[in-house]
Amino acid sequence: MKPTTIASLQKCKQNKKRFATITAYDYSFAKLFAEEGLNVMLVGDSLGMTVQGHDSTLPVTVQDIAYHTAAVRRGAPNCLLLADLPFMAYSTPEQAFENAATVMRAGANMVKIEGGAWLVETVRMLTERAVPVCGHLGLTPQSVNIFGGYKVQGRGDEAGDQLLSDALALEAAGAQLLVLECVPVELAKRITEALAIPVIGIGAGNVTDGQILVMHDAFGITGGHIPKFAKNFLAETGDIRAAVRQYIAEVESGVYPGEEHSFH
């Protein structure tokens, strides 16, 4: 199988073909996802909650991300693999570059960082040094203590305009992908249409170029609170492989996420 690349996703955007992505943390699930046609994966700092059992993503280290990135890469050698730079791992451009090198040596194709226009210098430096960057706007879980919890972001004209401005700034600095989390559908549509780069949504409606889900949410392994945007595909299919195939099919057809999974 040919490797999936950033150019592959750019082509999807140009052809208006929605694509599905998922978080992965280990060899076995990565292998299964790849075998069923999920060719874009994220080693997310969500592992702090789903794998390590913390109540936030903040305790996750660069070493944790690198460890899981290496495992996922062994399971899915041809996938486009994104890896989060965790909390306080990119407070300066130099620190970001050093930590990006660590996770890319472990097998990542691209790093994801959370934040707006204040990251422009960092994004530019990484891009100039051959480190592809995925931005992340909206609900950025590393900022949970600022937000006062996990809440929808970008409601109201001023907040929406700010997110659009941030998205354009990240793109201009060289970001090649953008994740939009927990924002109103109307804003997600504005941002997706304004950017030339592919936009991946989670809790942003079905108007983005792609979708991502935390794998545990896709299989109903939530341990309590179920996010509004989550759907348990395993409950409907009774089989993990069939659940993955249904997730892909519903994303590509625009069935998922539906109105019941979206914010306004």
Curated annotation (Swiss-Prot):
Q: How is the cofactor bound?
A: Binds 1 Mg(2+) ion per subunit.
Designated name of the protein? 3-methyl-2-oxobutanoate hydroxymethyltransferase
Q: Does the keyword Cytoplasm apply?
A: yes
Give the active-site positions: E181
Q: Which Gene3D superfamilies match?
A: Phosphoenolpyruvate-binding domains
Q: What is annotated about its quaternary structure and interactions?
A: Homodecamer; pentamer of dimers.
InterPro entries named among the record's database cross-references: Pantoate_hydroxy_MeTrfase, Pyrv/PenolPyrv_kinase-like_dom, Pyrv_kinase-like_dom_sf
Q: Which domain of life is it from?
A: Bacteria
Under Enzyme Commission nomenclature, its number is 2.1.2.11
First-listed, main subcellular location of the protein, grouped into a coarse class: cytoplasm
